[in-house]
Amino acid sequence: MKTKKATAVLATAIVLALSASACGGSDSKDDNSKGGGAGIDAGLTSVVNKSDKKGGTVTFEHSDVPDSLDPGNTYYGWVQNFSRLYGRTLTSFKPAAGKEGLEVVPDLAESLGESSPDAKTWTYKLRKGVKFDDGSPVTSKDVKYAIERSNFAPEALSHGPTYFKAYLEGGEDYKGPYKDKSPEGLKSIETPDDQTIIFKLNKPFADFDYLATFSQTAPVPQARDKGAEYVQAMASSGPYKFESYNEGRSATLVRNPHWDQATDPIRPALADKITIKFKVNPTTVDQHLMSDNITVDAAGTGLQTKTQPKVLTKATEKAKTDNSYAGATSYLALSTKVKPFDNADCRKAVQYAIDKASVQAALGGDTKGDVASTLLPPTVNGYQKFDLYQTEGNKGDVAKAKAALADCGQPDGFKTNLTARSDRPDEVQMATAIQASLKEVGIQAEIKQYPSGKYFGNFAGVPSYVKEHDLGMMMMAWGADWPTGFGFLDQIVNGSAIKPSGGNNLMELDDPTINKALSDGIAQTDAAARTKAWGEVDKLVMENASVVPLIYRKNLLYRPDSATNVTVTQAYLGMYDYLLIGSTT
């Protein structure tokens, strides 16, 4: 892997090359005018094949189905990115290259939130003139309703996070709009007029502008809501609306005639049409990218391990790649509610047993990520470097693992189940490497595969299913909801995030010390104090030993020649920014 210095030199050279190309005019027809001609990692620091030309079709493919394309019922990072095409949120991340893309900017709101001194009251003013695809005006009441349905109606919408429920006054008692028919709804969200929305919190929340970027703040008119069926005919507040939607198969988006560029400073909306197809074999997705038959792999996690040699060994193909840090960690979740992982020493045995170097190799080597020792990845604010379960060369320590097994009363090892997502070959290969490591210390792990689209809603994210089927170990990959330690940690280690289904705290970790540390940290109005707090929470989690960090993820992204306005966004897990991207086809 290149050193930071070498990468910086390369990035500088790329920027200079792009500047020289731009001076020559934008009508050049040579390869440097195409998405693939800018050079290796060009998309990390610049917008490749920059264009303001409207027209064409941007085509996406995905190896599985989404949890949902409903902005109020999703937790997948790629859907958060994709849904901005049809759903405007109160705030958003700036569509821009490099670190500029981490800046939070107003979207549906006129400006960032106005906070009270104690960070418990947040006020936003909506832009005037924003309309839904049927021509009706977007109001503050539509934003309020969107939050009510997305956070308080698990009987219909179970996939998204529950930050609003946890932090809004009275959130623990409100039953959601499908059960509570009172016209005022949740009283801690006030809408004194059509342009103003006020949030009253039960505790300080200094990251609220980040929370407002979440797709759950995309407005929903109550009259058009059909609960779980809303996804079949969603209202659009963005530049695109759904022309067709075939559940689990495909969708087509076309221009929203009532979208007004004057009200939307962050969306260029270049393409005339956007299509997405689901359940495409992941290797086929790679082939379609490399043959320029599609614009984007929607998952945004990069080329498959078996595809990588085809691009990395050929200079012209390698020049079309961006090896981005994903701001994400792959880890093994150990269920604290499934024996013998209710015993901390049994969890520590797994920490020492796993040969992380072999896991990295199974994933595809350092192109796909670095060996991890913490839950927080280095690119997220609050990261502190430490390793509580260090082994030589990251290859595991059989002796320490067996000693921990003896301490937990399992000297001969034990049997358990290990889950992975069936449509993610790299994850299955990682699980297979883990299985081999565990076998060396007497732990027999049977791999159970489930589809990613149902992984959290039906299997690993359902505590009753986990216990019934003895799913002691679960493969997991997680990226920050927003790029701070709280935005990364809260929904995966806070006890309040445990849900009947669709949960992401797969360990069912509910440690009062960790829960309090998270609450105390987000209440800090001093940024430096917040940053320090997240590293301390990370250490508490690692001391608990229910999370085995495996890899700080990297994506080997590929940009076909027809793609325009291509740049990596760290705000959305190191994938390409879907708001910017266009196509010459």
Q: What is each stretch, according to the model?
A:
Residues S19-A22:
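C-terminal motif of bacterial Sec signal peptides marking the signal peptidase cleavage site
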Residues D41-A42, N246, A353-Q384, D426-A436, ...:
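Detector for C-terminal structural segments
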Residues T59, V138-E148, D194-P204, G238-P239, ...:
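Alpha-helical secondary-structure segments
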Residues E61-P117, A235:
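N-terminal lobe/hinge region of extracytoplasmic solute-binding protein
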Residues K94-K99, K175, Q195, K200-A269, ...:
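Gly/Pro-rich hinge or "lid" segments in bacterial periplasmic/extracellular proteins
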Residues K125, D142-K144, R149-V220, N246:
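Surface-exposed binding/hinge segments that line
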Residues R224-M234, W259-V311:
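Ligand-site clamp/hinge motif
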Residues Y240, T367-D407, S422-Q429:
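Structural transition elements
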